[in-house]
């Protein structure tokens, strides 16, 4: 009998800081369970309008300038706990001209019409650009830039983004989120066969592992993951960028073990470091293109 897979569905928003903080957990799930798991996303629309939004605990909402200052402080505080990089300097996500996070949600739905894998890479880039690069990701210019980076067809993306089709798909996501009462993000729906469980808020990998074992009655087990340089390099190549905490979590590495592997890969020039706010990302080293000026042909 074919083994069932577990589905982990995240109710999310591209600019949600604890969704950003959950990236190490989701990547660890994908690494430890491999083909036994499928992750997907439902857009929840965190901020319809900053002027009518209000988070009393963090004093976010109303005036965009004050909100941006407090969001940056909140994200920095969260970063100390979840470990993902955040850039507070120059943070101006919301303004009179850009009062909502709905454009990012709709953009993800537009990307989904083309390719699920590229759409998820696009979602990751929106998270990185919002949290670690302090870019105003609600603008069409930035969204097109990010869509191009992940290989989406820009003409189709822009058409789907603006013709109402993606907005309709987003409205469907909002309805699904309301049916599951996913009002805070992240929230997770974990499904295995005809059984399911909702998790609300940030949760550790250990929590997910326990729930997967419970839902599958122990049938789904972690794969054997080698904790070595080759495996870490494969992980970085697969995801195209990884924060240190993502590597350490996925491979259960101590700080010392991680630093040893990182130092070796940097010395061998297998990877590069890219500074990002209060942290950095590890990227695969890409061989530069060489172009023949006569033929116009470029190759690596």
What are these regions (language model features)?
Residues 18, 96, 100, 236:
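Residue-level marker of regulatory loop/turn positions in helix-turn-helix DNA-binding domains and
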Residues 3, 102, 182-183:
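A generic fold-level signal
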